[in-house]
From Swiss-Prot:
It is found in: Lipid droplet; Cell membrane; Cytoplasm. The chain crosses the membrane at residues 9-29, 43-63, 138-158, 335-355. Gene3D superfamilies: Cytosolic phospholipase A2 catalytic domain. The lineage of its organism: Eukaryota, Metazoa, Chordata, Craniata, Vertebrata. This is Patatin-like phospholipase domain-containing protein 2. Keywords: Cell membrane, Cytoplasm, Glycoprotein, Hydrolase, Isopeptide bond, Lipid degradation, Lipid droplet, Lipid metabolism, Membrane, Phosphoprotein, Signal-anchor, Transmembrane, Transmembrane helix, Ubl conjugation. Residues 1-8, 64-137, 356-486 are cytoplasmic. The active site is at S47 (nucleophile), D166 (proton acceptor). It is a multi-pass membrane protein. The keyword DNA repair does not apply. Residues 10-179 form the PNPLA domain. Residues 30-42, 159-334 are extracellular.
Length: 486
């Protein structure tokens, strides 16, 4: 599919906690097709895909990266509200994991090869960052690419003085339209490396350049992207990514030779699973890659995953057996903890809010300045829209009230300048400049607009008087003539 004399790219889609699927795919590519990673022109990623792309380009330990994903998901599941709990700081957790796994010269390896998808806050446009000046700048770019508004916080992070949010909002799969781009997505669809769901539904949902087949399994995956599933589910997703990567390499004839799966000592006979893999590869070549290869055994997959990731997957399946964990898993203790949530949650929220406020103090001036600018921009935008809307209704309103008459001839007697000045209003006669006239005109417009929204409810004085029906007027009463005074 991609000969060595051509160029190609690799693009990882954003998927939240399902990024452990990317770890399985990246492990497969690095182990079975290292030339595919080493000779790729660019490796792109958005949101969680940017984290895997960064680890793949910089040569970081993928096993440790996958273990960090599982540990973060387990830490989020411990809380009542999961990742939305006030004490869970996603940005701080991602920054700490990147500081731990990335080497010191990671920015030198990433510049020019790694592309991180970002969404600019000012206009909502997509930006792909490919050059980094330091390790801190590379980490900050990943933090910006994974920052989901409201989910991770209210104030977006900044990179080189510009505010950015999650790159998946504007472009979740960078450069997907190019034919030489290998697209990786944990959602079944039209991506090159993705799960193959046995669904007959042909409907497709395309979300910011990501193809998602409309079926129940994808709906389940979408529900677990922001709220982490159980460790066993993450383990299966990582193994699924490894399987799908192998399927892609076999279908396109990109498996590196000698195959690490088949490299055994001469004295040791091939294992049954290796024989099955050989037979499956031959069957795939005979059928032209149309039939799906049967998935290899789980033990066989776990043997060739990175050792750190293998240990993390095994530890995720084992539950601790200490006394405290046993007591906390008892039903009465769990019921008591659930009943205490209305009392413990406000206390935990207050403590976490205080800690975040102290951590926010160094960035307060810059963030306050940004919020002030955004508030001013929003108010200015609303004023322009309101003025434009009122300006469209004003001419029609005036045309219904003002009647213009066209004169057919000039007046017989020309008016003098004094007569013309008498016709103009007094405020126009007394104005000294054109600016004064325009200011008065705007004042009249405001008074006229205020009059449009006022309703005259005043009644005349005789409106509420009781009127007698019309008829013959009653005769005045006749009084007897009074005797003259003595």
């Amino acid at each position: 599919m991609f000969p060595k004399e051509t160029t190609w790219n690799i693009s990882f889609a954003g998927c939240g906690f399902l990024g452990v699927y990317h770890i399985g795919v990246a492990s497969c590519l690095r182990e079975h097709a290292p030339f595919l990673v080493a000779n790729a022109t660019h490796i792109y990623g958005a949101s969680a895909g940017a984290l895997t792309a960064t680890a793949l380009v910089t040569g970081a330990c993928l096993g440790e990266a996958g273990a960090n994903i599982i540990e973060v998901s387990k830490e989020a599941r411990k809380r009542f509200l999961g990742p939305l709990h006030p004490s869970f700081n996603m940005v701080k957790t991602i920054r700490g994991c990147l500081l731990k796994i990335l080497p010191a010269d990671c920015y030198e390896c990433a510049s020019g090869r790694l592309g991180i998808s970002l969404t600019r806050v000012s206009d909502g446009e997509n930006v792909i960052i490919t050059h980094f000046n330091s390790k801190e700048e590379l980490i900050q770019a990943n933090v910006c690419s994974t920052f989901i508004p409201v989910y991770c916080g209210l104030i977006p992070p900044s990179l080189q003085g510009v505010r950015y949010v999650d790159g998946g909002i504007s472009d979740n799969l960078p450069l997907y339209e190019l034919k030489n781009t290998i697209t990786v997505s944990p959602f079944s669809g039209e991506s090159d490396i993705c799960p193959q769901d046995s669904s007959t539904n042909i409907h497709e949902l395309r979300v910011t350049n990501t193809s998602i087949q409309f079926n129940l399994r994808n709906l389940y995956r979408l529900s677990k992207a922001l709220f982490p599933p159980e460790p066993l589910v993450l383990r299966e997703m990582c193994k699924q990514g490894y399987r799908d990567g192998l399927r892609f390499l076999r279908r396109n004839g990109l498996l590196n030779r000698p195959n690490p799966l088949l490299a055994l000592p001469p004295s040791q006979p091939p294992a049954p699973e290796d024989a099955d893999a050989q037979e499956g590869a031959v069957a795939m070549e005979r059928t032209g890659g149309k039939d799906h290869l049967p998935p290899p055994r789980e033990d066989h997959i776990l043997e060739h995953l990175p050792s750190r990731l293998n240990e993390a997957l095994l530890e995720a399946c084992m539950e601790p057996t200490d006394l405290l964990t046993t007591l906390s898993n008892m039903l009465p203790v769990r019921l008591a903890m659930a009943m205490m949530v209305p009392y413990t949650l406000p206390l935990e929220s207050a403590v976490s809010f205080t800690i975040r406020l102290l951590e926010w103090l160094p960035d307060v001036p810059e963030d306050i300045r940004w919020m002030k600018e955004q508030t001013g921009s929003i108010c200015q935008y609303l004023m322009i829209r309101a003025k434009r809307k009122l300006g469209n209704h004003l001419p029609s309103r005036l045309s219904g009230q003002v009647v213009l008459r066209r004169a057919r001839s000039l007046p017989s007697v020309p008016l003098s300048c004094a007569a013309y000045s008498e016709v103009l209003p007094s405020w126009m006669r007394n104005s000294l400049s054109l600016g004064d006239v325009l200011a008065k005109w705007e004042e009249c417009q405001r008074q006229l607009l205020l009059g449009l929204f006022c309703t005259n409810v005043a009644f005349p004085p005789d409106a509420l008087r009781m009127r007698v029906p019309a008829g013959p007027a009653p005769e005045p009463p006749q009084h007897p003539p009074s005797s003259p005074p003595c």
